[in-house]
């Protein structure tokens, strides 16, 4: 029997006659709901088995035959009462999934081994049969509608033993299938650059949950982000190109119910932004005072109409008018100052099509005119052969850039290189000749600004190196005491200046002073002694230029 069901009344019988037969019985397992012993028949009772496997009680019945006051006990007989347990089924988790998803396989279990499970499904449209036995394999969930569909699965556990099937308490769980998310069709838009795109509010036919929307934009240059969620607010359309730009917006709906999001098929629409008239960028120019600018031919990427150009110049002193139309021809740049002058040229394009002029944004470029760098005056130098020159430090009045000084020397024999850059350090002057040597140094200031170098007007100065003064050899004289010497006239090979002479006499007793300048006139020689007297005259020449 099953736990909780009634055991049929047991009425003992016998073949004995001619007396009275009574019965006594014992029960070895009182857990089934029957006492341990009794006499007479066994009445109906409710079978009990609170365990998880069948319980069997053995009933031993002993007959006693009585006649004329004598009781005779006969052999006992046994029989069994088996009580099957009540099967159970473990709770099954509900499932919530999207149309087209695979369900999780359901494996039933319970406390009683050998239990089978019978189930019914009240909504076969989800893709599951109306009924079945055993576990439920994974299947593809189906919901072709617009609202969630929930199927209730009722599971009944059954334990069978001794050809007796015992059902347990049914349990239920649900499988809810969310619909495929949908988004309503969105109209395409065509707008102008700089104008507002109309707000886009997405809609759906789905109900019974929440539908959200995510979108992507394949062309962010129109002023809309690459992606977003929810509706698209009004935004200013952008097209910085020269032809219409079309962005394709792909919107994907997601339907959420019970915390499960289900993504539906995407839909697309377009936003087309027409361009604005434009002028191509113009390169800046940096040039030198007095040179020609590069002619400027304006251009545009716009097509399908005519683009004209008007321009204004904020610094006409560079040699260009204050305003004009069309291209700008080459002109001679002017800067009479000492620092760069920059003119800003602002160009406005006008695109005309069908008789309608459309003015686009302006663009600006600059023309910078570097000044002509001038070298400040440098003093000439006159030095002696072997003497040190004064270091020459160049300078200029030019500002706003870098000034470099390049110089050449037409007479490297003076001890200075034929050319160089920068200041000239002091050096030892050289002149191995007999006349002054003059070197002309030509220095050119080079002014650099904006990677453009501009040479100024060269300036010159001189370094004159006087020769080493010389005096020609003078013949020795031997004279008698009291006689006149021969006058001595000094001479030199030097030219190009004036050579003077100073002399000293180491023996004034001969009648000649101890020192003097210029030539030595004849004089009366004196020697009051008894032996010859020799005087040494040392002459020093000085060359002046």
Regions found by a protein language model. Give the residues of each.
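Extracellular low-complexity Ser/Thr/Asn/Gly-rich intrinsically disordered segments
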Residues: 1-545
């Amino acid at each position: 029997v099953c736990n909780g069901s009634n055991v049929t009344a047991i009425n003992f019988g016998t073949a004995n006659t001619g007396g009275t037969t009574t019965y006594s019985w014992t029960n070895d397992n009182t857990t089934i709901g029957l006492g341990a012993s009794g006499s007479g028949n066994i009445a109906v009772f409710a079978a009990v088995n609170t365990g998880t496997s069948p319980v069997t009680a053995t009933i031993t019945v002993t007959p006693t035959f009585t006649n004329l006051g004598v009781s005779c006990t006969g052999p006992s007989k046994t029989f069994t009462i088996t009580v099957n347990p009540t099967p159970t089924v473990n709770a099954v988790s509900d499932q919530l999934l999207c149309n087209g998803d695979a369900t999780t396989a359901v494996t039933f279990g319970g406390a009683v081994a050998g239990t089978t499970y019978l189930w019914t499904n009240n909504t076969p449209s989800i893709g599951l049969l109306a009924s079945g036995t055993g576990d439920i394999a994974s299947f593809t969930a189906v919901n072709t509608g617009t609202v969630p569909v929930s199927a209730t699965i009722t599971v009944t556990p059954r334990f069978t033993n001794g050809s007796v099937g015992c059902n347990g308490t049914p349990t239920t769980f649900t499988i809810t299938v969310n619909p495929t998310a949908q988004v309503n069709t969105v109209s395409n838009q065509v707008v102008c650059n700089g104008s507002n795109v109309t707000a886009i509010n997405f809609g759906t036919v789905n109900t019974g949950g929440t539908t959200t929307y995510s979108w992507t934009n394949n062309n962010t240059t129109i002023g809309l982000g690459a992606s977003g969620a929810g509706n698209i607010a009004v935004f200013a359309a952008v097209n910085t190109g020269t032809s219409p730009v079309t962005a394709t917006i792909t919107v994907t709906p997601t339907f959420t119910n019970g915390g499960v999001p289900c993504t539906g098929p995407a839909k697309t629409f377009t936003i087309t932004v027409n361009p604005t008239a434009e002028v191509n960028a113009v390169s800046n120019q940096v040039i030198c005072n007095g040179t020609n600018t590069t002619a400027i031919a304006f251009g545009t990427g716009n097509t399908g109409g005519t683009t004209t150009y008007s321009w204004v110049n904020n610094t006409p002193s560079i040699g260009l008018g204050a305003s004009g139309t069309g291209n700008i021809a080459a002109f001679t740049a002017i800067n009479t100052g000492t620092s760069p002058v920059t003119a800003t040229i602002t160009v406005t394009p006008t695109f005309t099509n069908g008789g309608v002029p459309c003015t686009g944004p302006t663009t600006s470029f600059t023309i910078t005119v570097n000044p002509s760098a001038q070298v400040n005056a440098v003093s000439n130098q006159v030095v002696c052969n072997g003497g040190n020159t004064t270091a020459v430090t160049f300078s200029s009045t030019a500002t706003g850039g870098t000034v470099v000084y390049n110089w050449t020397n037409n007479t490297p024999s003076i001890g200075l290189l034929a050319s160089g850059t920068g200041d000239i350090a002091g050096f030892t002057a050289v002149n191995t000749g007999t006349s002054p040597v003059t070197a002309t140094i030509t220095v050119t200031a080079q002014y650099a600004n904006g990677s453009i170098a501009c040479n100024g007007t060269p300036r010159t100065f001189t370094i004159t190196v006087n020769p080493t003064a010389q005096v020609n050899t003078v013949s020795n004289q031997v004279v008698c005491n009291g006689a006149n010497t021969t006058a001595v006239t000094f001479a030199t090979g030097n030219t190009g200046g004036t050579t003077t002479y100073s002399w000293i006499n180491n023996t004034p007793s001969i009648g000649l002073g101890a020192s003097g300048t210029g030539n030595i006139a004849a004089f009366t020689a004196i020697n009051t002694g008894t032996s010859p007297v020799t005087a040494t005259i040392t002459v020093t020449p000085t060359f002046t230029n």
